[in-house]
Amino acid sequence: MEEKNYHVDFKNKTIVLIYMLYFGDMVSISPFLEVLRREAKGSKILLVMDARFQESVKYNPNVDEIIPFDRHGKEKGMAATWKLGKKIGKLHPDILLTLHGTTRSTLLALAMGPKHWGGEEGTRLDSFFMDWPMTIETYNSHAVDKYLKVLERLGVKDLHHSGMRTFTSPEWEKKADAFYKSQGVSSEDRLVGLSVGSSTAEKNWPAEKYGQVADHFAEKGLIPVFFGVPSEIPLIEKALGAMKSKRYILAAGKLSMGEFMAAAGRCSLAFTNDSGPMYVFDSRGVPTIAMFGPSNAKFHHPLGPCSRAISSFDMPMGQEHVNKTIASGNYTPISEISMEEVIAAGEEALEKALKMK
């Protein structure tokens, strides 16, 4: 069934967005936020998001207020969800957009009572209350584009944007600089960032291969920097165990999310799996080589002019959920991606970036 298009006036409104996904997802909606801000002159834009990832958009100029929601902690229950919705309702929202519909987004929406409500349904109940219901996950476009299509269906004509972007602060930049200085890094040094983990083991290119890639670029004069969260340190240790070079920096567990974003921007090249750090490096203008296995590179690849996704197989577009793909076993393991292909992609990215300067 063909879905409807609408014409929405976004100017001089209080606009609430509900989007409670993960680190990388928050980076992927930055073009949406940029276009909405341009269209919504005189409006206040509020973003309801997972409290764990609020640093990812803390300094985004296209968001006026973040409403953090501790959905895995003290606000996990339905009563807390309803309470937050009632609190937001006191701001008298003119427009509510749910970019990822869930039972929780439905409850929030019903509690806040916006004048107009659009986006993705969280339950069948939503269709009785929504003014502009739509299917957002159509499995035929990149994550960035599927959210821009929401605005297009709401009548926005000018969809041009600056790509995925993350924004830091002078404080984060200062702390990132201090960290690098403590590791003996000078302003002339070139760094290669590596993020060896992801949300699930099946999405991880072998850590030992990351170590060998790090060795190759260390020989070229770049200093490998291993980023990550503390739980990824065992993986990083496997990578380090495969290295001959003893010159590397272990940044995992030593930087906040915002400080990582600042530190990532200092790199000349990055290697990652399909993960939040992939989008961060890319959003900071770093040539990013991203390895994909059971997740679909066509939906999630980095967008930078010098970035590239390498997939273990040509996954067709269509309905996809990485956990279901893993459970089915209908994919080529990410370990099948060769080290030689990854190194060649990195060399090409560096050369292309140099030509673009």
What residue ranges belong to the model's regions?
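Catalytic machinery of carbohydrate-active enzymes
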Residues: 1-357
